[in-house]
């Protein structure tokens, strides 16, 4: 074969290889990464925070619920009574604290001073009587028992005088700081009990925390529940998340904020739109639910993809194909 012909064939082959490589690269760029996942199953068990008898339930299995909707109520009467008791406790504690702060009135101080004078007079009389009895005892005019009775009366009068003096001193100086602090602490305790009673009454009504669909209703009216007992199981419908897994080789394509297209078997020509919201920082072995055979034994990273245009046709647990094409990434 002539040399020019050989060179020509080599050029043709090289051009074909280059063209093929370019076509493969371009095709890969156009098609992008494809992952397989499922719409995340998100359920929550709803319960009353307090216990009691179920008075009414407003929804049944299959009903759509909205955030803030009343779902059920316990018998409120026990909690209303507890609330009234707590309010009364606050009133008593407040009155006692106010008395401690205000101190004693002038009339009370005057009465205490009069009591001191009376006790002083009684003591003086008892002391004088005891002194006379001592003289009579020395002359053996009275018995030892008479002298002991006089001493006892004197000591009792002295104790009464001291008590009256202490009371007057307290009235004039006001209440001790420790007594005021104790009264304040009692008031704060009563206020905390009132807040707890108000919260318990509020929690005897079950409110939907978010939108969703009621899956199960575990009890009926008349049931006596312990606190925390499950009443409903709710499937959360918003937001809708897709759980998918990516291997380390393609991890750089799955960045938070990256937009993707989501395909389901029911509408293969009309994709949903999503955005990667979370990429797990740790690798894990591929879960059994992943449908891609070549990822079965790989270490992968979990993705959470938020569906931005979800509708009722996108059900929890549904398999989804995640497409990372250029069109999705730059929308």
From Swiss-Prot:
Into which family does the record put it?
Belongs to the UPF0194 family.
Q: Which HAMAP family match?
A: UPF0194
In which compartments does the protein localize?
Periplasm
In its UniProt entry, what is this protein called?
UPF0194 membrane protein YbhG
Q: What domain of life does the native source organism fall in?
A: Bacteria
Q: Signal peptide position in this chain?
A: 1-15
Q: Which residues form a coiled coil?
A: 107-208
Keywords on this record? Coiled coil, Periplasm, Signal
Q: Which gene encodes it?
A: ybhG
Record carries keyword Manganese: no
Annotated Gene Ontology cellular components are: periplasmic space
Q: Which organism is it from?
A: Escherichia coli O139:H28 (strain E24377A / ETEC)
